[in-house]
Amino acid sequence: MWTQRNAVGNWLLVLTAVIGFLTFIWIPQTSAECQTRSIYCYECDSWTDARCKDPFHYTALPRDQPPLMTCNGCCVKMVRHQRSRYEVVRRMCTSQLQINLFMVDHVCMMESSGNGHMCFCEEDMCNSSKNLHTNGCQLHLIPIAVAVSWLMGQLLSR
């Protein structure tokens, strides 16, 4: 028999499927964009070039900024010993790293000690940012997915 509870449960299943499909389609495209088009990334190390330190002066004249390089990957910003007098900032392209990771735009990885991090981004000169933020689209999907999962759990436990 068709009840209101069945209708709500079916609606939630459809919503979950749509969110899952959009997430499945969107995330691989984000990674693929990073690897298939050239962008410009800053190339510097604050140990040898004070212009690389945070706060980064992205409004300075190009001659007063660290060099840019063409990148066939993602821009990277690495920080070691953050918020200390020994802080070191390095900005580069992923093609210079000897790691093989599935990279998604605006993802940051923290050092286990909590004293540093490495962030990836896919736009021209994006590794000039002091704080790279998680992509807004992903942030909107997470609460929706959690809410749908909770509601489904409530309905199925009855």
Swiss-Prot record:
Subcellular location: Cell membrane; Membrane raft
Protein name in UniProt: UPAR/Ly6 domain-containing protein qvr
Membrane-spanning residues: 136-156
Tissues expressed in: Expressed in mushroom body (at protein level); overlaps with expression of Sh/shaker and nicotinic acetylcholine receptor (nAChR) components also involved in sleep regulation. Expressed in the adult brain and head. Enriched in the mushroom body, anterior optic tubercle, superior protocerebrum, antennal nerve and visual projection neuron fibers projecting into the lobula plate of the optic lobe.
Underlying gene: qvr
GO cellular component: membrane raft; plasma membrane; side of membrane
Species in which this protein is naturally found: Drosophila simulans (Fruit fly)
Record function comment: Bifunctional regulator of neuronal activity in the mushroom body, and possibly other regions of the brain, that acts as a signaling molecule required for homeostatic regulation of sleep under normal conditions and after sleep deprivation. Reduces neuronal excitability by enhancing Sh/shaker K(+) channel activity; possibly by stabilizing Sh/shaker to increase protein levels, accelerating its activation kinetics, slowing C-type inactivation and enhancing recovery from inactivation. Specifically affects the A-type K(+) current.
Keywords annotated in UniProt: Biological rhythms, Cell membrane, Disulfide bond, Glycoprotein, GPI-anchor, Lipoprotein, Membrane, Signal, Transmembrane, Transmembrane helix
